[in-house]
Design a protein with these regions (language model features):
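Intrinsically disordered, low-complexity activation-like regions
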Residues: 1-84, 89-191
């Protein structure tokens, strides 16, 4: 485990190395969350994640590659490393901050659609309706029904409840009766 991975270490781990035939292509394990994958992320990046949310890698946001790596480190990795715990969401504010900077600088345009998706995920993970609205607008550009379906599902939960009820237990929030009914059959988005 290293507390100071390089930008390339993060990007190569998530998207595979540049010379790999599947570099930058969708990977099923991103969404399926096998325990071995979660453990590998924890082993390789947990110390770096803690440093990242404390600002140690803020300089990464000065480049498109760096911003994407920092978003992954603060948004995607903790959802795997700390699945079903409050710490899964500890990097959300940092990831959202970096995503806003990246959008303002048009960084996502430097990447293929699969990689670009991860610049937008912090908006989909936000419990703010304006962030959700922006996320849906960004995901529309993908012209992919499945991607858009997930974005709308996330937004609809925020419209309905003002938060993600599946986070309530780990965040110490009480559920309303409506949220309890919803959680009986709801998608927990890997959490």
């Amino acid at each position: 485990m290293t507390a100071s991975p390089s930008i390339r270490d993060v990007l190569d781990f998530w998207f595979l190395p540049l010379d790999h035939p599947d570099h930058g292509k969708p990977q099923e394990l991103w969404w399926s969350g096998p325990a071995e994958f979660d453990a590998e992320i924890r082993e390789r990046f947990s110390a770096a994640f803690e440093r990242a949310i404390g600002g140690a890698f803020d300089h990464w946001r000065q480049s498109p590659d760096g911003a994407l790596a920092l978003i992954l480190l603060c948004d995607q990795f903790p959802r795997n490393m700390h699945r079903r715990s409050a710490h899964a969401f500890a990097g959300d504010a940092k990831a959202l901050e970096v995503a806003r900077v990246a959008l303002a600088r048009a960084y996502p345009a430097a990447f293929n659609l699969t990689m670009r998706l991860f610049f937008y995920m912090p908006f989909q993970h936000s419990e703010s309706l304006p962030d959700q609205d922006l996320g849906c607008a960004l995901f529309e550009a993908f012209d992919d029904a499945e991607t858009m379906k997930h974005a709308i599902e996330h937004r609809d939960v925020i419209v309905r409840f003002g938060r993600f009820p599946h986070r309530n237990d780990v965040l110490g929030r009480a559920c309303t009766d409506q949220e309890l009914d919803y959680l009986k059959n709801a998608n927990r988005y890997g959490q």
